[in-house]
Amino acid sequence: MKSHKSVRLISGIVILSVVFTLASTAGPVMAADKEEAQGIVDKAKVTLEEFLRDKNYSWVNEHINKEKGVLIYPQVLKAGFILGGSGGTGVFLARNAKGEWSQPAFYTMGSVSFGLQIGGEAAEVIVLCMNQKAVDALMTSKVKFGGDTSIALGPVGAGAKSNVVADFVSFAKSKGLYAGLNLDGSVVDVREGLNQAYYGKSLTPIQIVVEKKATNPGSSALRAALKKAK
Protein backbone atom coordinates (compact mmCIF):
# COMPACT_ATOMS: atom_id res chain seq x y z
CA MET A 1 0.00 0.00 0.00
CA LYS A 2 2.80 2.38 0.88
CA SER A 3 4.44 1.80 -2.49
CA HIS A 4 1.17 2.64 -4.31
CA LYS A 5 0.78 5.81 -2.25
CA SER A 6 4.36 6.77 -3.04
CA VAL A 7 3.76 6.26 -6.76
CA ARG A 8 0.62 8.40 -6.63
CA LEU A 9 2.46 11.08 -4.67
CA ILE A 10 5.34 11.15 -7.15
CA SER A 11 2.91 11.22 -10.09
CA GLY A 12 1.08 14.14 -8.51
CA ILE A 13 4.32 16.03 -8.00
CA VAL A 14 5.34 15.44 -11.64
CA ILE A 15 1.97 16.65 -12.93
CA LEU A 16 2.12 19.77 -10.77
CA SER A 17 5.66 20.45 -11.95
CA VAL A 18 4.55 20.25 -15.59
CA VAL A 19 1.59 22.53 -14.93
CA PHE A 20 3.75 25.14 -13.18
CA THR A 21 6.36 24.94 -15.94
CA LEU A 22 3.77 25.52 -18.65
CA ALA A 23 2.22 28.36 -16.69
CA SER A 24 5.56 30.05 -16.14
CA THR A 25 6.56 29.86 -19.83
CA ALA A 26 3.19 30.65 -21.42
CA GLY A 27 3.24 34.27 -20.23
CA PRO A 28 6.62 35.23 -21.73
CA VAL A 29 5.85 33.39 -25.00
CA MET A 30 2.50 35.15 -25.37
CA ALA A 31 4.10 38.50 -24.52
CA ALA A 32 6.79 37.94 -27.15
CA ASP A 33 4.18 37.04 -29.77
CA LYS A 34 2.15 40.11 -28.91
CA GLU A 35 5.24 42.29 -29.24
CA GLU A 36 6.02 40.70 -32.61
CA ALA A 37 2.44 41.25 -33.77
CA GLN A 38 2.48 44.92 -32.81
CA GLY A 39 5.83 45.31 -34.54
CA ILE A 40 4.34 43.95 -37.77
CA VAL A 41 1.39 46.34 -37.50
CA ASP A 42 3.73 49.30 -36.94
CA LYS A 43 5.94 48.29 -39.88
CA ALA A 44 2.86 47.80 -42.06
CA LYS A 45 1.95 51.43 -41.39
CA VAL A 46 5.43 52.55 -42.48
CA THR A 47 5.22 50.42 -45.63
CA LEU A 48 1.78 51.79 -46.46
CA GLU A 49 2.90 55.39 -46.02
CA GLU A 50 5.94 54.81 -48.23
CA PHE A 51 3.71 53.54 -51.04
CA LEU A 52 1.24 56.39 -50.61
CA ARG A 53 4.00 59.02 -50.75
CA ASP A 54 5.65 57.55 -53.84
CA LYS A 55 4.26 59.11 -57.04
CA ASN A 56 5.16 55.95 -58.95
CA TYR A 57 2.48 54.19 -56.90
CA SER A 58 -0.22 56.82 -57.33
CA TRP A 59 -2.59 54.05 -58.46
CA VAL A 60 -2.45 52.58 -54.95
CA ASN A 61 -3.25 55.96 -53.40
CA GLU A 62 -6.19 56.51 -55.72
CA HIS A 63 -7.72 53.04 -55.39
CA ILE A 64 -7.02 51.77 -51.88
CA ASN A 65 -10.11 53.46 -50.41
CA LYS A 66 -12.29 52.23 -53.27
CA GLU A 67 -11.50 48.54 -53.00
CA LYS A 68 -12.62 45.84 -50.57
CA GLY A 69 -9.43 45.26 -48.63
CA VAL A 70 -5.64 45.24 -48.51
CA LEU A 71 -2.79 42.93 -47.55
CA ILE A 72 0.36 44.71 -46.38
CA TYR A 73 3.67 42.86 -46.02
CA PRO A 74 6.52 44.96 -44.59
CA GLN A 75 9.04 42.38 -45.80
CA VAL A 76 8.82 39.42 -48.17
CA LEU A 77 11.97 37.41 -48.78
CA LYS A 78 13.20 36.85 -52.33
CA ALA A 79 12.86 33.06 -52.26
CA GLY A 80 12.09 30.15 -50.01
CA PHE A 81 8.76 29.09 -48.62
CA ILE A 82 7.95 31.33 -45.70
CA LEU A 83 5.98 29.86 -42.83
CA GLY A 84 5.87 32.72 -40.36
CA GLY A 85 8.45 34.30 -38.12
CA SER A 86 10.52 36.99 -39.79
CA GLY A 87 10.10 38.13 -43.33
CA GLY A 88 6.84 36.61 -44.47
CA THR A 89 4.12 37.90 -42.20
CA GLY A 90 1.76 40.78 -42.90
CA VAL A 91 -1.70 42.04 -42.10
CA PHE A 92 -5.05 42.05 -43.87
CA LEU A 93 -7.69 44.72 -43.33
CA ALA A 94 -11.09 44.94 -45.01
CA ARG A 95 -13.20 48.01 -45.76
CA ASN A 96 -16.94 47.88 -45.04
CA ALA A 97 -19.81 49.59 -46.85
CA LYS A 98 -19.37 52.70 -44.69
CA GLY A 99 -15.73 53.00 -45.71
CA GLU A 100 -14.45 51.95 -42.27
CA TRP A 101 -11.35 49.80 -42.02
CA SER A 102 -11.40 46.65 -39.90
CA GLN A 103 -8.93 45.50 -37.30
CA PRO A 104 -5.91 43.68 -38.80
CA ALA A 105 -5.68 39.91 -39.15
CA PHE A 106 -2.25 38.32 -39.54
CA TYR A 107 -1.26 36.26 -42.57
CA THR A 108 1.91 34.63 -43.87
CA MET A 109 2.92 34.50 -47.53
CA GLY A 110 5.18 31.95 -49.20
CA SER A 111 6.25 30.65 -52.58
CA VAL A 112 8.93 28.43 -54.09
CA SER A 113 10.42 31.51 -55.76
CA PHE A 114 9.24 35.09 -55.92
CA GLY A 115 11.69 36.00 -58.69
CA LEU A 116 12.46 39.64 -57.99
CA GLN A 117 13.34 41.26 -61.31
CA ILE A 118 15.91 43.61 -59.80
CA GLY A 119 17.63 40.95 -57.74
CA GLY A 120 16.87 42.41 -54.32
CA GLU A 121 16.94 40.27 -51.21
CA ALA A 122 13.56 41.39 -49.92
CA ALA A 123 10.59 43.51 -50.90
CA GLU A 124 7.75 45.45 -49.35
CA VAL A 125 4.43 44.28 -50.75
CA ILE A 126 0.90 45.63 -50.93
CA VAL A 127 -1.93 43.57 -52.41
CA LEU A 128 -5.30 45.21 -53.04
CA CYS A 129 -8.45 43.08 -52.82
CA MET A 130 -10.50 44.23 -55.79
CA ASN A 131 -13.79 42.45 -55.09
CA GLN A 132 -15.75 40.49 -52.51
CA LYS A 133 -14.47 37.22 -53.95
CA ALA A 134 -10.95 38.20 -52.90
CA VAL A 135 -12.06 39.05 -49.36
CA ASP A 136 -14.09 35.84 -49.04
CA ALA A 137 -11.09 33.80 -50.18
CA LEU A 138 -8.99 35.27 -47.37
CA MET A 139 -11.63 34.28 -44.84
CA THR A 140 -10.70 30.63 -45.45
CA SER A 141 -7.60 29.09 -43.93
CA LYS A 142 -5.41 29.28 -47.03
CA VAL A 143 -5.41 31.04 -50.42
CA LYS A 144 -3.28 30.31 -53.48
CA PHE A 145 -2.92 33.26 -55.83
CA GLY A 146 -3.63 32.16 -59.39
CA GLY A 147 -5.62 29.15 -58.17
CA ASP A 148 -9.25 29.90 -57.38
CA THR A 149 -8.45 33.61 -57.45
CA SER A 150 -6.58 35.71 -60.02
CA ILE A 151 -3.76 38.15 -59.33
CA ALA A 152 -2.07 40.76 -61.51
CA LEU A 153 0.78 43.24 -61.21
CA GLY A 154 -0.54 46.73 -60.58
CA PRO A 155 0.15 49.76 -62.79
CA VAL A 156 3.32 51.61 -61.83
CA GLY A 157 4.41 55.10 -62.83
CA ALA A 158 3.33 58.65 -62.15
CA GLY A 159 -0.24 59.13 -63.34
CA ALA A 160 -0.79 55.44 -64.13
CA LYS A 161 -4.44 54.97 -65.08
CA SER A 162 -4.62 51.40 -66.38
CA ASN A 163 -7.67 49.31 -65.59
CA VAL A 164 -6.75 45.95 -64.10
CA VAL A 165 -9.15 43.01 -64.15
CA ALA A 166 -8.19 40.59 -61.37
CA ASP A 167 -9.30 39.56 -57.90
CA PHE A 168 -6.02 40.76 -56.40
CA VAL A 169 -3.62 43.46 -57.63
CA SER A 170 -0.08 43.50 -56.24
CA PHE A 171 2.61 46.15 -55.88
CA ALA A 172 6.15 45.67 -54.62
CA LYS A 173 9.28 47.70 -54.06
CA SER A 174 12.77 46.71 -52.99
CA LYS A 175 15.06 49.22 -51.29
CA GLY A 176 12.71 51.97 -52.39
CA LEU A 177 12.71 50.89 -56.05
CA TYR A 178 10.15 49.09 -58.19
CA ALA A 179 10.28 45.31 -57.90
CA GLY A 180 8.43 43.22 -60.46
CA LEU A 181 7.36 40.63 -57.93
CA ASN A 182 5.29 37.83 -59.45
CA LEU A 183 3.01 36.46 -56.73
CA ASP A 184 1.19 34.00 -58.97
CA GLY A 185 1.30 30.64 -57.18
CA SER A 186 2.09 32.17 -53.80
CA VAL A 187 0.20 30.87 -50.79
CA VAL A 188 -1.33 33.15 -48.16
CA ASP A 189 -2.24 31.52 -44.86
CA VAL A 190 -3.69 32.68 -41.55
CA ARG A 191 -1.18 33.07 -38.73
CA GLU A 192 -3.43 32.00 -35.88
CA GLY A 193 -0.84 32.36 -33.12
CA LEU A 194 -0.28 36.05 -33.77
CA ASN A 195 -4.00 36.72 -34.05
CA GLN A 196 -4.49 35.10 -30.65
CA ALA A 197 -1.56 36.97 -29.10
CA TYR A 198 -2.67 40.34 -30.49
CA TYR A 199 -6.29 40.07 -29.35
CA GLY A 200 -5.84 37.94 -26.26
CA LYS A 201 -8.06 35.10 -27.48
CA SER A 202 -8.40 32.65 -30.33
CA LEU A 203 -10.23 34.29 -33.24
CA THR A 204 -10.86 33.46 -36.88
CA PRO A 205 -10.33 36.07 -39.61
CA ILE A 206 -14.11 36.39 -39.97
CA GLN A 207 -14.46 37.17 -36.26
CA ILE A 208 -11.72 39.81 -36.48
CA VAL A 209 -12.49 41.43 -39.82
CA VAL A 210 -16.23 40.98 -40.30
CA GLU A 211 -17.83 40.32 -36.92
CA LYS A 212 -15.52 42.70 -35.00
CA LYS A 213 -15.26 40.41 -31.99
CA ALA A 214 -12.14 42.16 -30.70
CA THR A 215 -10.13 45.35 -31.02
CA ASN A 216 -6.59 46.43 -30.28
CA PRO A 217 -5.82 50.16 -29.94
CA GLY A 218 -2.35 49.45 -31.31
CA SER A 219 -3.85 49.27 -34.81
CA SER A 220 -5.36 52.77 -34.74
CA ALA A 221 -2.38 54.46 -36.44
CA LEU A 222 -2.41 51.97 -39.32
CA ARG A 223 -6.15 52.33 -39.82
CA ALA A 224 -5.85 56.13 -39.72
CA ALA A 225 -3.13 55.99 -42.38
CA LEU A 226 -5.43 53.95 -44.61
CA LYS A 227 -8.24 56.42 -44.14
CA LYS A 228 -5.99 59.32 -45.18
CA ALA A 229 -5.40 57.85 -48.65
CA LYS A 230 -7.25 59.58 -51.48
Residue ranges of model-derived segments:
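N-terminal secretory signal peptides that target proteins for export/translocation
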Residues: 1-8
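Bacterial N-terminal signal peptides
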Residues: 12-24
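Small-residue-enriched, tightly packed secondary-structure blocks
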Residues: 31-230
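Sec/Tat signal peptide C-region and signal peptidase I cleavage site
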Residues: 24-31
